[in-house]
Amino acid sequence: MDNYVLNLLQLCDSTFPTGAFSHSFGLETYIQDGIIFNKETFSKWNKAYIKEQLVYSDGLACRLAYEALENNDMDTIWMLDGMLRAQILARESREGSRIIGERLLTLGNQLYPSSRLTSYVDRIAKGVSYGHPAIAFALISHSLSIPKNTTVMSYLFSSNANLVQNAVRGIPLGQTQGQQLIKESQDFIADAWNLIETLTEDDFGITASGIEISQMRHEVLHIRIFMS
């Protein structure tokens, strides 16, 4: 068995304490608007989120970050960190990504310490960098010698699984339905990974305006169970 497998399983475990369970990234707005109310309506939204948001932001950034690490190009890592920060227009989602990224990075550096992870932690502490889970995941995975393709696919899977679990609580859905959604989304995640492999840096940030607007509107909802 490859040595990295158990580390990767821990990194992608839903109990890994990044705080992702507190963020819906606009999903809760659609729930309160009555657009998402069951398994089928969430599945439709989730496919759009993966294809229109996750692919062109986090997913692509994770791949580009890993490739930069292969070339020992830390300047590109810091540039991607800034691009991800600027690309998230909604304040809550921007802050949510920062918090999740910082927690993933801090815990990752405690479990799998490396000079690059420490450098990222230090830059965030100094306010030079912001922190983002896609960058942190790439850094940790590269330090553990997890292959690039496995890294990007795992990041997509983990991000999707977290959103599904939040849908289970927010809509709400049954736990069995949640697992069905995760299983049913696997082919779509594989398609998303294939698409990411064809993209360039010029494709970064092509995201759906409807999802971004729902993320902006979330902070003025009267009742909320999620932070974004």
From Swiss-Prot:
What are the recorded GO MF terms, alphabetically? Answer: nickel cation binding
Show the InterPro entries listed in the entry. UreF, UreF_sf
Q: Which keywords label this protein? A: Chaperone, Cytoplasm, Nickel insertion
Q: Which GO terms describe its cellular component?
A: cytoplasm
Principal subcellular localisation of the protein: cytoplasm
Q: Where in the cell is it found?
A: Cytoplasm
State its role.
Required for maturation of urease via the functional incorporation of the urease nickel metallocenter.
The record's subunit annotation is: UreD, UreF and UreG form a complex that acts as a GTP-hydrolysis-dependent molecular chaperone, activating the urease apoprotein by helping to assemble the nickel containing metallocenter of UreC. The UreE protein probably delivers the nickel.
Family according to the record: Belongs to the UreF family.
This one is known as Urease accessory protein UreF
The species this protein was found in: Lachnoclostridium phytofermentans (strain ATCC 700394 / DSM 18823 / ISDg)
Q: What is the lineage of its organism?
A: Bacteria, Bacillati, Bacillota, Clostridia, Lachnospirales
